[in-house]
């Protein structure tokens, strides 16, 4: 176990031997030239030992760089072989799939060509330029097609006249509903535009009989005029004015007409003013 531990150590225990050999080599090289051939042979041997030692050191350093360095090449080789085998199997399966696809495509092409040959529309197909050409002449419909159309129209005719009866019934119901609607609309009273007017009727002086003045005003009767409440309002110096309310229809009674009718009573009425005017 100790030996295995020392195999992975990076300490160079024999370095002094190689240092001594290298020193002796350089001493002999730098020494006198009259050396014998034996010395030259010894120097070459030393050089070879040094080179071999360096190679061993490099190998030992490379081998001790990782615990799995010795088993690396064999492991890589086995993994490569396994991968190649899996690729070959995958290649074979892909080839089978491609062959199946080619066979399916060839069958489809054969079937399509057979359908095109057997189709009557394919035989009568013309170039598309003839369909869109403005100079193309439209052939009149054949007599046979016209006869078939007439037969279809004859088949659609109801011999018992049920459609006509239904149309008459629908027309009668529609007319009846329109008549009822017109009668209902005629009975409904039309909206009449009306206005509420407050009049100020002023007398000549404080001696004017206000009861007689009010009776004169209320004696004015017009179509669309309705008199309302009234009261006496003091003006000053013992004089009072008549404030009376009325409702008029705008289309029938105008304010000017109403003032003219009231001012006809010159003995009692001095003037008529509109104090308020409101639409109803």
UniProtKB/Swiss-Prot annotation:
<feature type="modified residue" description="Phosphoserine">
    <location>
        <position position="37"/>
    </location>
</feature>
<dbReference type="GO" id="GO:0005085">
    <property type="term" value="F:guanyl-nucleotide exchange factor activity"/>
</dbReference>
<feature type="modified residue" description="Phosphoserine">
    <location>
        <position position="44"/>
    </location>
</feature>
<dbReference type="Pfam" id="PF10587">
    <property type="entry name" value="EF-1_beta_acid"/>
</dbReference>
<dbReference type="InterPro" id="IPR036219">
    <property type="entry name" value="eEF-1beta-like_sf"/>
</dbReference>
<dbReference type="InterPro" id="IPR018940">
    <property type="entry name" value="EF-1_beta_acid_region_euk"/>
</dbReference>
<dbReference type="GO" id="GO:0003746">
    <property type="term" value="F:translation elongation factor activity"/>
</dbReference>
<dbReference type="InterPro" id="IPR001326">
    <property type="entry name" value="Transl_elong_EF1B_B/D_CS"/>
</dbReference>
<feature type="modified residue" description="Phosphothreonine">
    <location>
        <position position="147"/>
    </location>
</feature>
<feature type="compositionally biased region" description="Acidic residues">
    <location>
        <begin position="149"/>
        <end position="168"/>
    </location>
</feature>
<feature type="modified residue" description="Phosphoserine">
    <location>
        <position position="86"/>
    </location>
</feature>
<comment type="function">
    <text>EF-1-beta and EF-1-delta stimulate the exchange of GDP bound to EF-1-alpha to GTP.</text>
</comment>
<feature type="modified residue" description="N6-acetyllysine; alternate">
    <location>
        <position position="117"/>
    </location>
</feature>
<feature type="modified residue" description="Phosphoserine; by CK2">
    <location>
        <position position="162"/>
    </location>
</feature>
<feature type="modified residue" description="N6-succinyllysine; alternate">
    <location>
        <position position="117"/>
    </location>
</feature>
<dbReference type="GO" id="GO:0006414">
    <property type="term" value="P:translational elongation"/>
</dbReference>
<comment type="similarity">
    <text>Belongs to the EF-1-beta/EF-1-delta family.</text>
</comment>
<feature type="modified residue" description="Phosphoserine">
    <location>
        <position position="133"/>
    </location>
</feature>
<dbReference type="InterPro" id="IPR049720">
    <property type="entry name" value="EF1B_bsu/dsu"/>
</dbReference>
<keyword id="KW-0251">Elongation factor</keyword>
<dbReference type="InterPro" id="IPR014717">
    <property type="entry name" value="Transl_elong_EF1B/ribsomal_bS6"/>
</dbReference>
<feature type="modified residue" description="N6-acetyllysine">
    <location>
        <position position="17"/>
    </location>
</feature>
<keyword id="KW-0007">Acetylation</keyword>
<feature type="modified residue" description="N6-acetyllysine">
    <location>
        <position position="107"/>
    </location>
</feature>
<comment type="subunit">
    <text>EF-1 is composed of 4 subunits: alpha, beta, delta, and gamma.</text>
</comment>
<feature type="modified residue" description="N-acetylalanine">
    <location>
        <position position="2"/>
    </location>
</feature>
<protein>
    <recommendedName>
        <fullName>Elongation factor 1-delta</fullName>
    </recommendedName>
</protein>
<dbReference type="Pfam" id="PF00736">
    <property type="entry name" value="EF1_GNE"/>
</dbReference>
<dbReference type="GO" id="GO:0005829">
    <property type="term" value="C:cytosol"/>
</dbReference>
<dbReference type="InterPro" id="IPR014038">
    <property type="entry name" value="EF1B_bsu/dsu_GNE"/>
</dbReference>
<feature type="modified residue" description="Phosphoserine">
    <location>
        <position position="106"/>
    </location>
</feature>
<keyword id="KW-0597">Phosphoprotein</keyword>
<feature type="region of interest" description="Disordered">
    <location>
        <begin position="113"/>
        <end position="171"/>
    </location>
</feature>
<keyword id="KW-0648">Protein biosynthesis</keyword>
<feature type="modified residue" description="Phosphoserine">
    <location>
        <position position="60"/>
    </location>
</feature>
<feature type="modified residue" description="Phosphothreonine">
    <location>
        <position position="129"/>
    </location>
</feature>
<dbReference type="GO" id="GO:0005853">
    <property type="term" value="C:eukaryotic translation elongation factor 1 complex"/>
</dbReference>
<feature type="modified residue" description="Phosphoserine">
    <location>
        <position position="119"/>
    </location>
</feature>
């Amino acid at each position: 176990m100790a030996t295995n531990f020392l195999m992975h150590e990076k300490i160079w225990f024999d370095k002094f031997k190689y240092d001594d050999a290298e020193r002796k080599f350089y001493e002999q090289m730098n020494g006198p030239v009259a050396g014998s051939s034996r010395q030259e042979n010894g120097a070459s041997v030393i050089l070879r030992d040094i080179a071999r030692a360096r190679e061993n050191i490099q190998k030992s350093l490379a081998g001790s760089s990782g615990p799995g360095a010795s088993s690396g090449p064999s492991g890589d080789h086995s993994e490569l072989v396994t991968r190649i085998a899996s690729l070959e199997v995958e290649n074979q399966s892909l080839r089978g799939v491609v062959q199946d696809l080619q066979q399916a495509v060839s069958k489809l092409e054969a079937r399509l060509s057979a359908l095109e040959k057997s189709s009557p529309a394919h035989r009568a197909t013309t170039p598309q330029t003839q369909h869109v050409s403005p100079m193309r002449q439209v052939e009149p419909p054949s007599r046979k097609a016209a006869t078939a159309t007439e037969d279809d129209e004859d088949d659609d005719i109801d011999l018992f006249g049920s459609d006509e009866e239904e149309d008459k019934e629908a027309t009668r119901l529609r007319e009846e509903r329109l008549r009822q609607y017109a009668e209902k609309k005629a009975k409904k009273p039309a909206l009449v535009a009306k206005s509420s007017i407050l009049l100020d009727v002023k007398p000549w002086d404080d001696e004017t009989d206000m009861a007689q003045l009010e009776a004169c005003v209320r004696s004015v009767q017009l179509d669309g005029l309705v008199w309302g409440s009234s009261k006496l309002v003091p003006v000053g110096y013992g004089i009072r004015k008549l404030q009376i309310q009325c409702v008029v229809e705008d289309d029938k009674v105008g304010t000017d007409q109403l003032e003219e009718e009231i001012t006809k009573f010159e003995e009692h009425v001095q003037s008529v003013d509109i104090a308020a005017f409101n639409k109803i």
